Amino acid sequence: MMGSTLLRILVSLVLSLAIAARAYKHKSLNRSGAMMGFVVMAIHIAAGYRFGVLILVFFFTSSKLTKFGQEKKRTIDEDFKEGGQRNWIQVLANSAIATVLVVILVTITGGEDRCLDTKNSALITGLTGGVIGHYACCNGDTWSSEIGMLSKGQPRLITTFKPVKKGTNGAVTIEGLLAAAAAGFVIGLAYTLVGLLTTGCAGDVAWKQLLVVPIATAMGLCGSLIDSLLGATVQFSGYCSLRKKVVSKRAPSVTKISGMNILDNNGVNAASILLTTLLTSVACLYIF
């Protein structure tokens, strides 16, 4: 047991360092983002391979989608940066809650992967469900945003269904919503496949682990909808006549589209992640 734990810690350090360095080289993360990314990834992988695969699937798929169609996104996104270049605040906004949960879990389990089973441990089931929901939300929101910006469909504000310009906070498209569900599906599938190799679930408990896939799919969509609802109501969107873009800050040249200036994009992301994490945790307690 001690040997496998030490091996996992070593793997976590080497793999996280390699991924963070590569991400910095390819401009997926800036310097501060790469440093924070290394810490967060190392914690997840050291806590359990299932948790490690969740953050890695989220990171790699979101990074690829961020770079897809960059020329078009450059004309839409006010904060566009070549390659994405997420900083430490963005990394933390998309990983802080899950990092806290996996640290609690590894403290309880000693790094042993456990099945989702409330009869054995409701606490472990609830906390693990929260981690799954966290990354289903993160992946769903990212896929939805990145694919939605490239959609040929007309974005509509989620609160009024009024047609709005691309880049408006709280706007949704059919393609974006389907992408969110697909993103959640990928998270659930990755967790389940790795779990088959790392857990000793048996009987009905083993079969029930497959329910993670539809749960994560639903939470990918749900998390994206929550993010859009918050974006449309507590995050300001306006059209700048000078930059010819939708922006998130008031100015003399900006005409309001929607939302109050209460939270910025990182705040909206963190709030939607927290709500989806709690929702998934409760769902897992009832289902498993």
Label every model-predicted segment:
Residues M1-F288:
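Hydrophobic alpha-helical transmembrane segments
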